[in-house]
Amino acid sequence: TETIPAVFRLLTNKEVALPPFSATSTLPSLMNGGKDFSPWSKKDDLLYNTIRGPVMAVLGRDGVGLPDCALAESKFEKGENISGRMLTIISRMSELRNNGTPDMEFAVSGLLARSQLAGGRGEDARRTVLALREQFEERGLTRFFPNMDAMLCRIDLHTGQLDRADEWYRAKAPRDPIHLNVMKRYQYFTQAMVEIADGQPDAALMTLSPLGPYIKTCGRYIDGIHLHILTALALHRSKAEGWQTHLTEALDTAAEFRFIRTVSVYGTAVLPLLEKLEWSKDAKWKNQLMADVRAQAAYYPLFLQPRLPPGEELTPTERQILYLLCADKSNAEIARIMDSKLPTVKTHVS
């Protein structure tokens, strides 16, 4: 909290000049962009109120919209409803576009898309990203496309558009575990998700493995949560030991920062593992987490689930029952909601 005001004074007195930089590294995130700001999120309100002005003054164009977006993303990761915050930020998009940077535009649109996805509005999330992609294409900002396309792939995985996800995997996934490029880590994680969804857990483990040392050395807490959850999923799918250790590591880190959506975004994929795991370090946080995980599972019951063989796709009735099961409804409750007989529901569930 003392560094930013000090730099502000130096800049004001023209004693130092800042070189250009990217707060996001072309990622759709400020909290987990060029730097991991998880430690800051523990005091997000205090920091916002005390250094918002100096940050914007110090960073110039790079600071336009940054404090508000960073605070909103911190609250989002903690499971809060950020609809009101997003309305305020979106109302200033013209100012951001004219006076800020495309990095911040992507961070804001990325956060909007993630909040839409978390609210069960997957198609809205896809439209948000596609709209920005079209604008960036007109402005020649193609450097954002690799991570933007990876984000679209993640949305496709949530909404069951597996053919589109596979198309991204074939044409755009890095698929080179030997030569790690940490700037592509968002794409590596997306690649691992597709591999898990396609029933290739061993390939996912190969994709994820090189990221471990970098994430640990550089203190990438959010990336670490994703790494451990995806590793746990891949190990569990391959019926290997050790998934409990990785999931415990992810929960320990998430609980430290009070993060909810970093874990709950995996919804129906991680739900059975969470129900099996004995973890009781913070009951209140765990209850909040499980509620959000079940909500995501209900919105996207096929996320990262093995692809069904041709001819075995779920019927609309089966999809509705799966949706309600993920919402933690009992067979009797499902029967009442669907105006069906209990034995009929039990037949579908079995």
Feature roles, as predicted:
Residues 4-12, 243-259, 294:
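TPR/TPR-like (Sel1-like) alpha-helical repeat modules
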